[in-house]
C-alpha cells in the first residue's frame, strides 16, 4: 500500500491502524515549512505539525515522502532551501523521498481570485525551472532521493490550469539546470567532461542545458560546445 495524504490526517489512532497493513510509502503534502507561507495558503497546519508527523512515521520505520512546492504566495527560494535543511535535520539516517511541484493557478480557486486582483503573480516557466533546479541540486547534496519534479500530466489538470509554470518537460529541464549547477560548481570555466547519458539533458528543448551553461559561465554557446566532451 502506498498513499499520499494531508499532514493533519495522522493521530495515534491512525498510526495504530497502519500497523495492520503492508505500507510501502507514505507521502505527505507538506508544501512548505515556512509558517507565513502556510498561513497565506490556508493549509491548516504549522511547520511544527509536519515535523512531528514525519518524526513519528520515521520512528515507526515507514518510508516517508514529502511533497514540496515552489512559487507559493509569499514564498522565496531561501525559504525552500531552509525547508530542505529542516527535513534533512529531522530525517537523520532515515530515507526521505521528495517530490517538487510548481504552484499552478486552477479555475475557481482562491488563488485565481488573488491572481485576478493582482495580488499573486505566478512563476514563469523559466523561473520555475531555475528554482526547482536549485532545489533539486541542494536536495541531492543533502542526500535526498528525488522522485519527481513537476506534475503528472492529465486531461483534468490541463483543463483546470489558467496560469503558472505548466509544462510537460518542467522536470527534465529542472534536472538539466541542476546538472549545470553541479558542473559549474566543480569547475566554473571548464573544459567539462560529461557522461553521454546526459547529452539529451543538455541538448534537448532547443539546447536548454547548453544555453543555461553559457548564461551561468559567461561564455557563448559556441564556446560552451567547444568546452564540452562527452565520455
Residue ranges and their predicted role:
Residues 1-61, 65, 69-100, 107-126:
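Conserved non-cysteine loop/helix-boundary elements of the Radical SAM core domain that shape
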Residues 6-8, 103, 197, 224:
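Generic structural motif
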Residues 30, 102, 194-196:
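Short secondary-structure boundary segments
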Residues 101-103, 151-152:
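Histidine- and/or cysteine-centered catalytic micro-motif in compact active-site loops
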Residues 110, 117-231:
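Auxiliary Fe-S-binding modules of radical SAM enzymes
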Amino acid at each position: 500500500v502506498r498513499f499520499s495524504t494531508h499532514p493533519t490526517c495522522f493521530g495515534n489512532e491512525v498510526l495504530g491502524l497502519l500497523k495492520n497493513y503492508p505500507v510501502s510509502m507514505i507521502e505527505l503534502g507538506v508544501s512548505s515549512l515556512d509558517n507565513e507561507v502556510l498561513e497565506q495558503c490556508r493549509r491548516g497546519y504549522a511547520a511544527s505539525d509536519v515535523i512531528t508527523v514525519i518524526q513519528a512515521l520515521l520512528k515507526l520505520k515507514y518510508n516517508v515522502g514529502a511533497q514540496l512546492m515552489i512559487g507559493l504566495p509569499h514564498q522565496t527560494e531561501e525559504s525552500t532551501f531552509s525547508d530542505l535543511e529542516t527535513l534533512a535535520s529531522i530525517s537523520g539516517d532515515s530515507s526521505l523521498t521528495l517530490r517538487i511541484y510548481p504552484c499552478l493557478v486552477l479555475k475557481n480557486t482562491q488563488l485565481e481570485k488573488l491572481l485576478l486582483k493582482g495580488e499573486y503573480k505566478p512563476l514563469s516557466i523559466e523561473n520555475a525551472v531555475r528554482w526547482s533546479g536549485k532545489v533539486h541540486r541542494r536536495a541531492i547534496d543533502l542526500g535526498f532521493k528525488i522522485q519527481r519534479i513537476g506534475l503528472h500530466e492529465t486531461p483534468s489538470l490541463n483543463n483546470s490550469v489558467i496560469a503558472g509554470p505548466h509544462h510537460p518537460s518542467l522536470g527534465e529541464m529542472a534536472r538539466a539546470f541542476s546538472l549545470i549547477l553541479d558542473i559549474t560548481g566543480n569547475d566554473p570555466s571548464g573544459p567539462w567532461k560529461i557522461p553521454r547519458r546526459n547529452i539529451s539533458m543538455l541538448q534537448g528543448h532547443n539546447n536548454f542545458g547548453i544555453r543555461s551553461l553559457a548564461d551561468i559561465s559567461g561564455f557563448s554557446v559556441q564556446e560552451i560546445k567547444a568546452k564540452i566532451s562527452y565520455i
